[in-house]
């Protein structure tokens, strides 16, 4: 026989199940998961975050512009960062070699410290995302067959052509469509259709016969 729990015992059991282990914080419970630890160290997406990435040592211009950029930004709050960079680049070019020399010395000192701290450091520029080609964006069609409709005597008739049809032949079709002889257009298009169909089914006579019998002849009114 199963014992019946009263309301107090049931409430205590629910609270104990929802309460973390005694003497342990929620941070300790969260770090029990190795996947969570890895995400925390790498920035959440499995890659090295910007904080863990070793930065290049500053050059002379960066040492000089570090304080100058802050000053220009305070004097011109509405100026964009790109405009500030252009202005600083122009000012740096206007400095003499004697004025630039202290910043070159500071840059050399920072580079020496960087080599001591990171002896195996190698500069790895970030790869720029290349735009995908248009042919890769479009899904590959299962068949290279294209269909169009031809207007003859105010009636639409389907017309099929394949990749074997050259651009010149297709342009001739367009010229024929613009002419004033709809009956001749229909006959020429049907002849080309049967020509390409017979070419594609040349290896199979039975299939060719079935294909030709399935298409009824066209008699213009």
UniProtKB/Swiss-Prot annotation:
Residues 194-221 are annotated as: Disordered. One of its GO terms (cellular component) is cytoplasm. It comes from the Eukaryota. One of its GO terms (molecular function) is RNA polymerase II cis-regulatory region sequence-specific DNA binding. InterPro entries: HMG_box_dom, HMG_box_dom_sf, SRY, SRY-related_HMG-box_TF-like. Residues 54-122 bind DNA. Transmembrane segments: none annotated. It is found in: Nucleus speckle; Cytoplasm; Nucleus. Transcriptional regulator that controls a genetic switch in male development. It is necessary and sufficient for initiating male sex determination by directing the development of supporting cell precursors (pre-Sertoli cells) as Sertoli rather than granulosa cells. Involved in different aspects of gene regulation including promoter activation or repression. Binds to the DNA consensus sequence 5'-[AT]AACAA[AT]-3'. SRY HMG box recognizes DNA by partial intercalation in the minor groove and promotes DNA bending. Also involved in pre-mRNA splicing. This is Sex-determining region Y protein. The gene is SRY.
């Amino acid at each position: 026989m199963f014992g019946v729990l009263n309301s107090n015992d049931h409430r205590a059991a629910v609270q104990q199940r929802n309460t973390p282990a005694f003497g342990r914080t929620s941070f300790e419970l969260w770090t029990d998961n190795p996947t969570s630890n890895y995400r925390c160290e790498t920035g959440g997406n499995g890659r090295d975050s910007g904080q863990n990435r070793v930065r290049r040592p500053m050059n002379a211009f960066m040492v000089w512009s570090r304080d100058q950029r802050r000053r220009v930004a305070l004097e011109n709050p509405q100026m964009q960062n790109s405009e500030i960079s252009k202005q600083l680049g122009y000012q740096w070019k206007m400095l003499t070699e004697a004025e630039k020399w202290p910043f070159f010395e500071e840059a050399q000192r920072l580079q020496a410290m960087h080599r001591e701290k990171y002896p195996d450091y190698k500069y790895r520029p970030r790869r720029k995302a290349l735009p995908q080609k248009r042919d890769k964006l479009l899904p590959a069609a299962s068949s290279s067959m294209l269909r169009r409709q031809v207007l003859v005597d105010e009636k639409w008739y389907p017309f099929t052509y394949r990749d074997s049809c050259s651009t010149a032949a297709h342009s001739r079709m367009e010229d024929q469509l613009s002419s004033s002889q709809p009956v001749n257009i229909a006959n020429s298009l049907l002849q080309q259709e049967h020509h390409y169909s017979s070419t594609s089914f040349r290896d199979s006579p039975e299939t060719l016969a079935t294909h030709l019998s399935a298409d009824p002849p066209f008699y213009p009114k």
